[in-house]
Regions:
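Short acidic-hydrophobic, aromatic-tinged amphipathic segments that line or gate anion-handling sites
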Residues: 76-77, 127-130
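Short, well-structured N-terminal submotif of metal-dependent ribonuclease cores
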Residues: 1-37, 51-66, 70, 108, ...
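Short secondary-structure transition/capping segments
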Residues: 49, 69, 88-90, 124-127
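Phosphate/NTP-binding elements of NTP-utilizing enzymes
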Residues: 45
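Active-site neighborhoods of divalent-metal-dependent phosphate/nucleic-acid chemistry enzymes
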Residues: 55-61, 69-117
């Protein structure tokens, strides 16, 4: 299975593993699965740190550089096709970052791993619920 972690799942997988369900933990650890991250999640972590909603040590840039090297992840490149697909998967979702993640899952044929109720109700892409 090809899994795209949403931003919260990515951060929790590194910092708060107890927030992951047994099924999600198992899927992320399964070597048969590919685990992907979007540059949108990297950007979103930076924004959360700038707003003071997330604190990473020693700082956001160093933490993310280390996190991206420590855990082998595939990068879901942001493309024009992904941007255009945001209007198909969750056109009324209020969070643009979430719309990009849903569109990325659709375009790349990935399963979006999320706890977000709005994303779990999305159309045109598969999800793995963190419940």
């Amino acid at each position: 299975m090809k899994l795209l972690m949403d931003t919260h799942i990515w951060v929790w997988s590194l910092l708060e593993t107890d927030r992951l369900s047994h099924g999600v933990s198992k899927a992320l650890a399964d070597p048969a699965n590919e685990v992907w991250v979007s540059p949108i999640s990297v950007w979103e972590v930076l924004v959360l740190c700038q707003k003071g909603r997330l604190v990473l040590q020693p700082d956001a840039m160093a933490w993310m550089s280390g996190a991206l090297l420590r855990v082998p992840l595939k990068e879901a490149t942001l493309t024009h096709e992904v941007a255009l697909a945001t209007g198909q998967v969750a056109p009324h979702h209020p969070d643009p970052a979430d719309r990009f993640l849903a569109a990325t899952a659709k375009v790349y044929g990935l399963t979006l791993v999320t706890s977000n109720c709005n994303l779990l109700a999305g159309k045109g892409f598969s999800v793995l619920a963190n419940r």
